[in-house]
């Protein structure tokens, strides 16, 4: 246990945001809030940091205190043992959150609770000594880490109060049930004299009325909790929807209400937001505060939020029309940063850091990649660099698309499946390739959002699945100039194959397009030329303003001097995989490499790719929050740019004052310390050691010279020189694809279990 506390304190000290002194807070300009009292909305941590550790465990409570904004509130769901001891657990049944069913496998019972028969292991059947000494906690949401299961004891209410959170909220869900079994939550509270309890909530009107005078003397706020609109409130036997019609009556026994978040922003069957209800306005008019519950980073919620949990909080606290007075969350640091750092953020604020926000096929998390809509949204979202991976049609038109194979990212399968072919130089599976179709044929199909997580059931913005138009390279460059973006990135793929086998000179086409756009004759906008082929980059050496970026598409663990010297001959920057900077195993960050430092010593910039918002793509160490991942790579690893499919998330972070760790402020978004979270788990639960990534071999940087563009017959199927030798960037394609498939299968098992 001592080891646990030492390691955990180190984890807190090194990797999470600790609130600073109130004096620093005074320097921050006051924000105008649309809450009932005009104050900042409260962050209420349900069971501490229950999104990571078992609910109300000492770890969950300590981490919530260490990562939340000053003045946050700790929420404990009160349950009572048969000898009257108060515990902090969300359910009256113990089997979903503890090991009780394995300790007493034959002790399942059935009780009637609020008119319904429930089966399980009920807390009222066990005394406190049994629960504290024989039962341990488990994570009750299966997509969350199970590595801490069975290691932490159930917390008594007094244990949580002993952590001295800034504020404490006690939720009493089952007063009527406990009273039936001769246990009184009201008497339990009186025994505590309400000390340290700032807020008490309950869905039972009778209970709130019974403690009203005591709570008033203790200056404890009472909150009435609404359940499902069709559920029945035990005291009045009225549906909650009926009680909602007379909010003014609630003011007689409570100062606020707690509602599921869809009472405020309902979501339709397609998972898009419906117009906001008038609930907050009506409650505020009645003099009631409004708290919204149900927030978590690892829930699939409205597509309007683009899998960015901060966007959801902002919808409730900074929509220009109203603000809730507080949010109940399993991930308090995300709520804290959303309210403290991102609310009332002027869209024109300058970035706090030097890192570039570079798109991956535009805003391809929201629209089909490389379409006009994806690029426009990326520009609107504040991206610095928009990107175009250049593909070629059979008749020589250069256009922007993620890959030469159109199968996954267009509707080509419905029309051109008979044109599918095998091109082992590009990929190990058959595909419908752009260079086998004319531009007119390509334009006859629709773009399609490419979803890297289809196997796990995740979707991306299905309402716009096929929206937008394909973008030619010329149109892309004109868009970049017209919108005055910081720069453009041109990614050149398969140049050797296209030249030798298809008679298409993609390098020459790109050079010509840049010349025609005059981007080769100015220094106002950046031009980045990216390729996994060093010979392609060398062909642009004669244009000094261009930044040449070598894409290294395999995991590396080190960058030896010989490899770096070879990179310097061809490139000014590298594009590296996330796992080349921070190693990950089973969704835990296990360590970090020195690759960024090694590249920077040689004056080589480092861009990291690809960042996505979906929580299944984000290590637990980042709190299932894309913002923490951004902070880890930008502030923690010092990268020079992030390549992302959701540029709005990256831009919001970089424009927030909380991203500047040199400022003295009340809250900062700090990077995670890779590997620290795993040390909290017991030794027996540790992950098996994984071998380090191999170092970058200089041979993998060197490519043969580009072959000349072959003169082929007009049908594009004859002629051409012999097969070219394999390029460095394609050496590991087959292996990487196999690993990707295995990883996808593993994710599917992990997140559908």
Swiss-Prot record:
The keyword Repressor does not apply. Expressed in flowers and siliques. One of its GO terms (cellular component) is membrane. GO terms for biological process: glycerol metabolic process; lipid metabolic process. It is found in: Membrane. It catalyses: a sn-glycero-3-phosphodiester + H2O = an alcohol + sn-glycerol 3-phosphate + H(+). The keyword Nucleotide-binding does not apply. InterPro entries: GP_PDE_dom (IPR030395), PLC-like_Pdiesterase_TIM-brl (IPR017946). Its main location: membrane. SUPFAM superfamilies: PLC-like phosphodiesterases. The chain crosses the membrane at residues 731-751. Its EC number is 3.1.4.46. Glycans are attached at residues 304, 516, 603, 715. Belongs to the glycerophosphoryl diester phosphodiesterase family. This is Glycerophosphodiester phosphodiesterase GDPDL6. It comes from Arabidopsis thaliana (Mouse-ear cress).
């Amino acid at each position: 246990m001592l080891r646990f506390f030492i390691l955990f304190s180190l984890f807190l000290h090194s990797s999470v945001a600790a609130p600073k002194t109130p004096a620093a807070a005074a320097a921050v300009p006051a924000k105008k809030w649309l809450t009932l009292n005009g104050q900042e909305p409260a962050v209420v941590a349900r069971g501490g940091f229950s999104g990571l550790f078992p609910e109300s465990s000492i770890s969950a409570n300590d981490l919530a205190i260490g990562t939340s904004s000053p003045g946050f509130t700790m929420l404990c769901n009160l349950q009572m043992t048969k000898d009257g001891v108060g515990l902090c657990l969300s359910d009256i049944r113990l089997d979903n959150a503890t090991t009780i069913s394995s300790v007493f496998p034959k002790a399942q019972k059935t009780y009637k609770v609020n008119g319904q028969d429930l089966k399980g292991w009920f807390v009222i059947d066990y005394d406190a000594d049994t629960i504290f000494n024989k039962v341990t906690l488990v994570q009750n949401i299966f997509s969350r880490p199970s590595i801490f299961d069975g290691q932490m004891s159930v917390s008594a209410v007094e244990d949580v109060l002993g952590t001295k959170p800034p504020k404490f909220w006690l939720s009493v869900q089952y007063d009527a049930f406990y009273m039936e079994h001769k246990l009184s939550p009201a008497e339990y509270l009186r025994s505590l004299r309400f000390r340290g309890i700032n807020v008490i909530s309950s869905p039972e009107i009778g209970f709130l009325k019974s403690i009203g005078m005591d709570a008033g003397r203790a200056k404890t706020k009472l909150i009435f909790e609404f359940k499902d609109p069709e559920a029945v409130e035990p005291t009045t036997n009225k549906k909650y929807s009926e009680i909602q019609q007379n909010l003014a009556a609630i003011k007689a026994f409570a100062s606020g209400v707690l509602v599921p978040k869809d009472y405020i922003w309902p979501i339709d069957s397609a998972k898009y937001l419906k117009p906001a209800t008038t609930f907050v306005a009506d409650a505020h008019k009645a003099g009631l505060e409004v708290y919204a519950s149900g927030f978590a980073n690892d829930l699939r919620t409205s597509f309007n939020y683009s899998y960015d949990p901060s966007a959801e909080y902002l919808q409730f606290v900074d929509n220009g029309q109203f603000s809730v007075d507080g949010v109940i969350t399993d991930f308090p640091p995300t709520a804290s940063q959303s309210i403290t750092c991102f609310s009332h953020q002027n869209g024109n604020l300058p970035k706090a850091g030097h890192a570039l926000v570079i798109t991956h096929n535009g805003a391809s998390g929201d629209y089909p990649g490389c379409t006009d809509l994806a690029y426009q949204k990326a520009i609107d979202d504040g991206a610095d660099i928009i990107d175009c991976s250049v593909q070629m049609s059979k008749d020589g038109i250069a256009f922007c698309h993620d890959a030469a194979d159109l199968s996954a990212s267009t509707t080509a399968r419905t029309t051109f499946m008979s044109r599918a072919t095998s091109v082992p130089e590009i990929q190990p599976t058959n595909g419908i390739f752009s260079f086998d179709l004319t531009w007119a044929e390509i334009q006859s199909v629709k773009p399609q959002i490419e979803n890297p997580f289809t196997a796990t059931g995740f979707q991306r913005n299905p309402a716009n699945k096929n929206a937008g138009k394909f973008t030619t390279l010329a149109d892309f460059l004109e868009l970049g100039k017209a919108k005055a973006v910081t720069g453009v990135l041109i990614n050149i793929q398969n140049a050797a194959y296209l030249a030798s086998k298809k008679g298409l000179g993609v390098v020459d086409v790109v050079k010509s397009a840049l010349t025609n756009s005059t981007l080769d004759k100015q220094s106002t906008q950046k031009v980045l030329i990216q390729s996994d082929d060093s010979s392609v980059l060398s062909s642009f050496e004669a244009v000094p303003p261009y930044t040449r970026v070598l894409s290294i598409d395999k995991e590396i663990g080190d960058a030896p001097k010989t490899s770096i010297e070879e990179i310097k001959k061809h490139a000014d920057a590298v594009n590296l995989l996330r796992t080349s900077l921070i190693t990950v195993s089973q969704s835990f960050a296990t360590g970090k490499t020195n690759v960024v430092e090694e590249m920077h010593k040689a004056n080589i910039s480092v861009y990291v790719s690809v960042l996505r918002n979906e929580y299944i793509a984000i290590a637990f160490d980042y709190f299932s929050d894309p913002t923490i991942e951004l902070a880890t790579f930008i502030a923690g690893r010092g990268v020079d740019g992030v390549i992302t499919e959701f540029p709005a998330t990256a831009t919001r972070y970089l424009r927030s004052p909380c991203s500047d760790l040199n400022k003295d402020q009340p809250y900062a978004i700090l990077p995670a310390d890779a590997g620290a979270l795993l040390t909290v788990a017991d030794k027996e639960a540790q992950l098996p050691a994984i071998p380090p990534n191999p170092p970058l071999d200089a041979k993998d940087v060197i490519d043969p010279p580009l072959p000349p563009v072959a003169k082929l017959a007009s049908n594009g199927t004859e002629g051409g020189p012999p097969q070219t030798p394999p390029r460095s960037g394609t050496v590991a394609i087959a292996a990487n694809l196999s690993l990707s498939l295995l990883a996808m299968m593993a994710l599917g098992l992990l997140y559908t279990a």
